[in-house]
A protein has these predicted regions:
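N-terminal, intrinsically disordered charge-dense segments
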Residues: 3-11
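Alpha-helical interaction segments
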Residues: 6, 16-17, 228-229
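Short hydrophobic targeting helices and cationic amphipathic motifs
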Residues: 12, 17, 27-28, 41-42
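Post-transcriptional modification and biogenesis factors for structured RNAs
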Residues: 35, 39-278
Length: 278
């Protein structure tokens, strides 16, 4: 069934028509004047992920399992396939927000390696390691480096049920001395071969799945600790990013979504007045 969001005024009517099988939509603006009518149709989505009621319900379930008290800091990890693989692992274990430290303004990920996970995980970019570490410590996180040292903890013995941020370093040099100095400790993956390190994407996957194992045993995936208003905001931005951008630009609240993920009300400004779209 095609759902239509209608905004009506005496001289202007706006419809938002989501295509039911793909996340594609149109803003259809009809201006009515005596003796004539003009129509302006604006395509706001060209290619998006499929949006069906089942996919919307799946997204809600995913958010209920999110682990906001577990995150990753990628320090100068620049290779696109490594970035994508780490973020894919984060999404798989329920991490919805990660941090990256780099002087490069824009990250490039290989979509094949990410398998679309970049859409579902928010990336916070920091220019300095100290900025990221201090922010997370202020939020109550314990910060630990994936780094070999004499006092490093075997990742299988580390308590991942605590509020934890893991720092993974660059492909060639690992984590920086600055990161080691700022962190609360180091965690290692025991190695029995000639080499003393794993690829960053492999190391992160091993540690994150150990974290998932511990948290699942502790029942932490059933907590549902993300507040409802935050969940509603994230869902709207996931499935209607262009409309969300329009709302943010014009200071408008997001329209409510119904149980199937369709917009259930017209767009309104902060004073409650119905707004017309360009």
């Amino acid at each position: 069934m095609l759902r239509v969001t209608l905004v009506s005024r005496s001289d202007h009517t706006v419809l938002y028509l989501p295509e039911p099988r793909l996340m594609t939509g149109f803003f259809l603006s009809l201006t009515l004047m005596p003796g004539r009518a003009s129509v302006n149709c604006q395509l706001i989505r060209k290619k998006r992920y499929p949006m069906t009621p089942d996919r919307y319900k799946k997204a809600r379930q995913v958010l209920k399992h999110r682990q906001p008290d577990l995150t990753v800091i990628m320090e100068n990890v620049h290779k696109p396939h490594n970035l994508a693989a780490v973020i894919r692992s984060c999404d798989a274990v329920g991490i919805g927000e990660v941090h990256a430290i780099s002087s490069i303004k824009y990250f490039r990920m290989r979509q094949k390696a990410a398998s679309g996970s970049g859409k579902w995980v928010n990336i916070n970019i920091h220019r300095k390691t100290s900025d990221a570490v201090q922010q997370l410590k202020n939020e109550g996180f314990g910060v630990y480096c994936a780094h070999f040292s004499e006092d490093a903890i075997d990742f299988r013995q580390f308590d991942f049920t605590q509020k934890t941020a893991l720092i993974f370093g660059s492909e060639l040099e690992g984590v920086s001395d600055e990161a080691v100095g700022l962190a609360d400790g180091n965690i290692i993956i025991p190695m029995m071969g000639m080499v003393q390190s794993l690829n960053v994407s492999v190391a992160s996957a091993l540690m994150l799945y150990e974290a998932q194992r511990q948290r699942e045993l502790a029942g932490m995936y059933e907590r549902g600790i993300i507040e409802q208003d935050v969940m509603d905001k994230v869902l709207f931005e996931w499935f209607y990013p262009d409309v969300a951008k329009y709302c943010n630009k014009h200071g408008m609240p997001y329209p409510a979504l119904d149980e199937d993920g369709y917009m259930a009300e017209p767009l309104k400004d902060r004073t409650g007045n119905i707004r017309k779209l360009p």
